[in-house]
Amino acid sequence: MKSVLIFLVAIALFSANIVSADEQTTRGRHTEPDDHHEKPTTQCTHEETTSTQHHHEEVVTTQTPHHEEKTTTEETHHSDDLIVHEGGKTYHVVCHEEGPIHIQEMCNKYIICSKSGSLWYITVMPCSIGTKFDPISRNCVLDN
């Protein structure tokens, strides 16, 4: 048994010396530059990048409440009176100038009048939940 142990220790010592010699050789090769060879140089590669310009268009949409009913408009030819059918009711609208106007009977909604030539067109717009149309500021404001 002693002979096996001595044999293993001898192999371990011999292996340690070989590794140690390799480490010294490796270190010598990398740390001591050879005068006959050029020093290693580092080259940085410059990659050119090109970018394509993208044109983005923002589209703003407003979501109408799900409970909103179909609105139709009819134009009358005999007067400036426009008729709005909404929620089973009929409203007569007279536009005097372009822009938003309030119809008292239409809860939380307003109408935008626009003119093209001699014809008036109207668009019914809802205010957001919790707001109402203020005829003075001509905007939807908090419903207090």
UniProtKB/Swiss-Prot annotation:
InterPro entries: Chitin-bd_dom, Chitin-bd_dom_sf. Residues 92-144 form the Chitin-binding type-2 domain. It holds the Pfam family CBM_14. Keywords: Allergen, Chitin-binding, Disulfide bond, Signal. Residues 24-77 are annotated as: Disordered. It comes from the Eukaryota. Disulfide bonds join C127-C140. One of its GO terms (cellular component) is extracellular region. SUPFAM superfamilies: Invertebrate chitin-binding proteins. GO terms for molecular function: chitin binding. Residues 1-20 form the signal peptide. This is Major allergen Blo t 12. It comes from Blomia tropicalis.
